[in-house]
């Protein structure tokens, strides 16, 4: 699907029929919700039995075996836009078109370190460029071959191991929102999107399930799918915050309903037993409650053979995946609002200035091309972040996004007005 076309989630009116249809749509959070329920101390036999009754399990042969209980764990989380079970009226109501297969509408990667001290969530753009059997393809289309093909794609393209698979129905998650009542989402600016149905003023909103749906569907903004990823992660943080709040989980009846809501929309691989999953979550209690680092794969747009792709930014993506595999804490990359208020001056030293500029803009930073860093004899090969005095934190966000080293700004370099960070683009940006 090219940018600008209607997404697979059309405007929804919350009628009885729409509630039934919502169960067939997909977004990610059910695993996080179920893990969080367990992590706050609800790992009772009743919870296990209720979850197991409502879960769906499938075999996924491509998964890597976990040798020891204490090993690191890597989950592939998918929301699918499959039309299975939808009649023509359903498709028209939800603006789904005539596509009969399935694609991954949301792809996230959850990494849990061996020492259980780090839990990180990374979103993949739907239009991310990947190779499938020697052919160029969008990541969203790779799921047409099922979970095994998507796992192979992540392994072959990014060397990411996958131990467990989960597909999550939006219906179950919308039921979680209904059980919670509302979810508070705060917006820095108005959001109006005819395609998703979003219509919000700037400020904080107690969103209903229908309003949340319009919010997380929206691709409104210059960064298209990366805008939607930001909104999905904002939603996840808000819901996980509500789930870990004492007021939410103090009511046993509410806990019971939440467990049923999450599990009903959840499909898991058949290797992850419910007691094992809840036991893992119990080990992560303090980490989940403290907040889960979330980010997206750094990428830049490119048009290839008439199709719009997001191409992974090589150095930044490789550094991110290395951290996930090794269980390292993900470096801070700033909030969406903080990145939007950070201006990066891009100095063209190597061959990758345009790619660096585009990657930073799609990550949410403001950029100015044409900054100067003085003599470049030792630069050109490796993209380097220069730290403006007093802007160390912002420089860290940029360095983490680009997977780049940082150096103090040379005394002789003048900082343009309004610029917070300077980046000297290198040839490595093209790899």
Language-model features: where?
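Non-catalytic, solvent-exposed segments at the cell envelope interface
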Residues: 2-431
């Amino acid at each position: 699907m090219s940018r600008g076309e209607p997404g697979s989630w059309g405007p929804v009116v919350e009628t009885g029929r729409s509630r039934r249809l919502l169960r067939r749509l997909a977004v990610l959070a059910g695993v996080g919700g179920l893990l969080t329920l367990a992590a706050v101390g609800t790992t009772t036999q009743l919870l296990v039995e209720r979850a197991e009754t409502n879960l769906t399990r499938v075999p996924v042969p491509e998964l890597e075996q976990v040798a020891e209980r204490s090993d690191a764990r890597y989950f592939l989380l998918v929301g699918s836009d499959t039309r299975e079970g939808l009649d023509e009226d359903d498709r028209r109501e939800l603006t789904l078109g005539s596509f009969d297969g399935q694609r991954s509408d949301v792809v996230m990667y959850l990494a849990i370190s061996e020492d259980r001290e780090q839990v990180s969530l990374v979103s993949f753009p739907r239009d991310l460029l990947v190779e499938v059997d020697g052919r160029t393809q969008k990541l969203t289309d790779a799921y047409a071959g099922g979970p095994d093909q998507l796992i192979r794609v992540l392994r072959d393209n990014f060397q990411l191991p996958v131990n467990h698979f989960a597909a999550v129905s939006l219906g179950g998650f919308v039921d979680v929102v209904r059980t919670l009542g509302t979810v508070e989402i705060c917006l820095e600016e108005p959001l109006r999107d005819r395609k998703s149905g979003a219509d919000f003023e700037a400020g904080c909103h107690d969103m209903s399930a229908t309003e949340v749906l319009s919010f997380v569907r929206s691709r409104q903004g210059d960064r298209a799918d990366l805008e939607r990823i930001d909104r999905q992660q904002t939603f996840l943080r808000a819901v996980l915050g509500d789930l870990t709040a004492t007021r939410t989980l103090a009511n046993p009846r509410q806990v019971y309903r939440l467990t049923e809501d999450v599990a009903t929309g959840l499909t898991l691989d058949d290797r992850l037993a419910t007691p094992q999953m809840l036991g893992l979550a119990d080990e992560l209690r303090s980490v989940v409650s403290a907040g889960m680092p979330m980010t997206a794969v750094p990428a830049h747009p490119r048009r290839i053979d008439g199709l719009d792709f997001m191409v992974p930014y090589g150095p930044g993506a490789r550094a991110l995946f290395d951290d996930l595999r090794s269980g390292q804490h993900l470096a801070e990359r700033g909030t969406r609002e903080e990145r939007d208020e950070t201006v990066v001056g891009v100095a063209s030293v190597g061959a990758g200035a345009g790619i660096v500029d585009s990657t930073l803009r799609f990550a949410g930073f403001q950029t100015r091309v044409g900054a100067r860093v003085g003599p470049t004899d030792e630069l050109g090969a490796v993209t380097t972040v220069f730290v403006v005095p007093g802007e160390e934190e912002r420089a860290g966000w940029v360095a983490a996004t680009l997977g780049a080293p940082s150096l103090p700004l040379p005394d002789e370099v003048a900082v343009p007005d309004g610029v917070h960070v300077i980046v000297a683009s290198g040839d490595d940006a093209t790899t």
